[in-house]
């Protein structure tokens, strides 16, 4: 069983939903990304999603687009990101998932990427613009290196494609709460719950719901019908607001912690004391 599946199995035994924060690697810089990984693990993240910056992030809203632009202006590369994950993983045990467009990974080399990602401690990779009909070789490569291939499904995903994704995915299925790009929203539609039911009809994999989740109330709502909630733009927006602050790490950590505390589920991260002592030295 992969570490991603072990995490979901542990959540099921504990009777609680998963909390998956997203950050863009290299925003505002790669050293801060390393410290944020440690901090988010300390406050209670179950899995951390790390975005690979790309120059044409068509699936992302303005907040994450700006984060990608800032990271690219700093010259952040795939190699930098993997090295960052490797350093952070010396101090944390939370599974890490890369969220990327295919172009940066192709440029790096898919076999090399899978090998280096595994060595760095990455547990799963989601390629947002790779359709399942063209993903056989990619999926086989990831599985060869014990990495979980993660796929997106949306309310507009056809039943046929949903079945293909169910056959190829490992770890969990990433369900998009609504059609469109990433970004925080005030309200969620019924489409999300309907989509999760459709996934369950063809797969026994856990389902994480993302895109548009930004409040504790929304997280609680998602946990009623999905195994985990992904919080992206809301956290990236906090990083953007605090980019010039020397207290960025603590304040982003407090923001993430506040979301969890307001769900009335308090929990320490894995090795939280150790992670905090490490972060204070970085």
Q: Where is each model-derived feature located?
A:
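Glycine-rich phosphate-binding active-site loops on the catalytic face of alpha/beta enzymes
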Residues: 47-55, 124-126, 131, 175-183, ...
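Alpha-helix-loop-beta-strand connector modules within alpha/beta enzyme cores
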Residues: 61-97, 140-150, 154, 190-207, ...
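Glycine/Thr-rich beta-alpha phosphate-binding loop at enzyme active sites
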Residues: 64, 74, 152, 162-201, ...
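Catalytic beta/alpha-barrel core
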Residues: 73-76, 122-134, 148-157, 182-185
């Amino acid at each position: 069983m992969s570490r991603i599946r072990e995490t979901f199995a542990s959540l099921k035994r504990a009777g609680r939903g998963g909390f998956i924060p997203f950050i863009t690697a290299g925003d505002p810089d790669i050293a801060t990304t390393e410290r944020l990984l440690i901090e988010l693990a300390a406050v209670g993240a179950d899995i951390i999603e790390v975005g690979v910056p790309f120059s044409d992030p068509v699936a992302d809203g303005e907040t994450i687009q700006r984060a990608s632009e800032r990271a690219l202006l700093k010259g952040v590369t795939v190699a930098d990101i993997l090295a960052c994950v490797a350093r952070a993983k010396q101090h944390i045990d939370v599974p890490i998932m890369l969220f990327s467009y295919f172009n940066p990974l192709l440029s790096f080399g898919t076999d090399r990427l899978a090998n280096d990602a595994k060595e760095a401690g990455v547990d799963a990779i989601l390629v947002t613009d790779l359709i399942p009909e063209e993903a056989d070789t990619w999926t086989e490569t990831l599985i060869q290196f014990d990495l979980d291939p993660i796929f997106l499904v949306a309310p507009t995903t056809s039943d046929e494609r949903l079945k293909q994704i169910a056959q190829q995915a490992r770890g969990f299925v990433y369900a998009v709460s609504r059609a469109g790009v990433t970004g925080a929203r005030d309200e969620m539609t019924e489409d999300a719950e309907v989509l999760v039911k459709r996934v369950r009809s063809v797969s026994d994999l856990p389902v994480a719901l993302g895109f548009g989740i930004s409040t504790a109330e929304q997280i609680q709502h998602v946990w009623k019908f999905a195994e985990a909630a992904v919080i992206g733009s809301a956290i990236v927006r906090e990083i953007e607001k605090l980019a010039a602050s020397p207290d960025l790490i603590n304040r982003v950590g407090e923001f993430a912690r506040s979301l969890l505390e307001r769900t009335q589920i308090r929990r320490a991260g894995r090795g939280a004391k150790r992670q905090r002592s490490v972060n204070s030295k970085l």
